UniProtKB/Swiss-Prot annotation:
Name of the protein described by the UniProt record: Monobin
Keywords: Blood coagulation cascade inhibiting toxin, Cytoplasmic vesicle, Disulfide bond, Hemostasis impairing toxin, Protease inhibitor, Pyrrolidone carboxylic acid, Repeat, Secreted, Serine protease inhibitor, Signal, Toxin
Post-translational modification note: The N-terminus is blocked.
PANTHER family attached to this UniProt entry: BPTI_KUNITZ INHIBITOR DOMAIN-CONTAINING PROTEIN, KUNITZ-TYPE PROTEASE INHIBITOR-RELATED
Record localization: Cytoplasmic vesicle, Secretory vesicle; Secreted
Linker, as annotated region: 74-85
Function summary: Tick salivary thrombin inhibitor that plays an important part in the anti-hemostatic strategy of ticks.
Disulfide bond entries: C22-C70, C31-C53, C47-C66, C86-C139, C95-C120, C112-C135
């Protein structure tokens, strides 16, 4: 059981790091063309390439890496995303567990909203995201 908990924690840490990198703005840096490389950046609607200085942090080496890390198609975000993950009531529950602030996609306002999660599901478990950024990536119409 401890091994499973450790694995889940490791996955959560990697996911959080990936989300942060997806949201980093592209920085050009200052270098001549001979020191530039192409990296891929998430733009909110997909991954696009851009020339950057070779020592620039952020971005992905390939379009596939960017897609895997930053889009629903890459499987990084809630697998129920799309119509199922971006609709219905969030899983508020009332199990008496510790209250945790999470985000869900409100299909009426087409925005990501907060809700109090209490450790069990009484709504759509796919419409629950740990961060607002994760919700906006999974439900693109939230950020447009």
């Amino acid at each position: 059981m401890r091994l499973l908990a450790l694995f889940a924690f490791a996955v959560a840490v990697v996911s959080a790091q990936r989300n942060q990198m997806c949201q980093q703005p592209r920085t050009q840096g200052s270098c001549d063309a001979s020191n530039q490389i192409t990296k891929f950046f998430y733009t909110g609607s997909g991954c696009t390439s851009a020339p950057v200085c070779s020592d620039t942090d952020g971005g992905y080496g390939t379009e596939d890496e960017c897609i895997q890390a930053c889009t629903v198609q890459g499987g990084h975000h809630n697998e129920g995303a799309g119509e199922e993950g971006c609709s219905g009531d969030p899983p508020r529950g009332d199990c008496g567990g510790q209250v945790e602030e999470r985000y869900y996609f409100d299909s009426t306002t087409r925005t990501c909203q907060t809700f109090e999660y209490r450790g069990c599901s009484s709504g759509n478990p796919d419409n629950s995201y740990e961060t607002e950024i994760e919700c906006e990536i999974a439900c693109p119409s939230a950020s447009s």
